[in-house]
Each structure stands twice: as C-alpha cells, then as structure tokens.
Amino acid sequence: MSLTLRVLAPDKSVFDDTVEEVILPSTTGLLGILPGHISMVTAIDIGVLKLRSSNGNWDSIALMGGFAEVESDDVTVLVNAAELGKSIDKATAEKEFEQAKAALNKLEDQAGNSADKLKAKESLNKARARSQAVGE
C-alpha cells in the first residue's frame, strides 16, 4: 500500500507522487502518516516534510506553513511556499540561516518593536527549514 502525496503552493505544484510514508511538521509536533491513517486536517508549521519513496529513500521538502488533509490514503498539503530539499543550494541556505540568526540576536539585544522581532523569528524559522531540508 502507498499514499498519494501532493504539496501545493499558490504558484506551483511542488510534489505530486506516490510515497510510502510522510512526516509532517504540524503546529503540535511531528506527525507521521502511513497508509490507512485516519482522516484528518491539521495546521502545518514552518519546517521540513520528510517523505519515504517506494524505493526506500527519504527526501525532504521545506514548508513555510499551511494546512494538510489526510483522507483515504491521499495526503494534500497546502502551503504558503515550499521547496524541494534537493533543489536548495546548501551554501546559500546556511548563509541565510546565519544571517537570520544574527539579525534576530541584534534585535533581541535592543528594546523596541516586537513586530520586528516576530518577523525576524519567522525569517529564522524559514531559513532553518531550508537549511535542514537541504541537509536531509
């Protein structure tokens, strides 16, 4: 048995194929999906989706938040943005992660606008997801 996984962003279909297993970064923690999983809808956090293909290899997709629906061995993930781990340049992702971390540290040392700090934390989370997806 297998699952049909679709990862859709507003501007493109990121992934559409059959897989053996999916691990989703839900807002309440990692969520493993295998064939026969109960139907559900869950919120997706910024993080890394892991999928095991029929050949047993694991691949990663960086997700930038959204929702996932599981129904009858179909997993549909609707996200704000997504990127296949194998298409991310490792050096660029690591550089962006370090820059985001430095920007957040600079803001946390200052008293001031919490909206800027929230944006910096979100940027750090996105950069971390991209960096982790490429390293998987």
From Swiss-Prot:
Residues 112-136 are annotated as: Disordered. GO terms for molecular function: ATP binding; proton-transporting ATP synthase activity, rotational mechanism. It holds the Pfam family ATP-synt_DE. F-type ATPases have 2 components, CF(1) - the catalytic core - and CF(0) - the membrane proton channel. CF(1) has five subunits: alpha(3), beta(3), gamma(1), delta(1), epsilon(1). CF(0) has three main subunits: a, b and c. Belongs to the ATPase epsilon chain family. Residues 116-125 have a biased composition (Basic and acidic residues). It is found in: Cellular thylakoid membrane. CDD domains: F1-ATPase_delta (cd12152). This is ATP synthase epsilon chain. Produces ATP from ADP in the presence of a proton gradient across the membrane. It is a peripheral membrane protein. Keywords: ATP synthesis, CF(1), Hydrogen ion transport, Ion transport, Membrane, Thylakoid, Transport. One of its GO terms (cellular component) is proton-transporting ATP synthase complex.
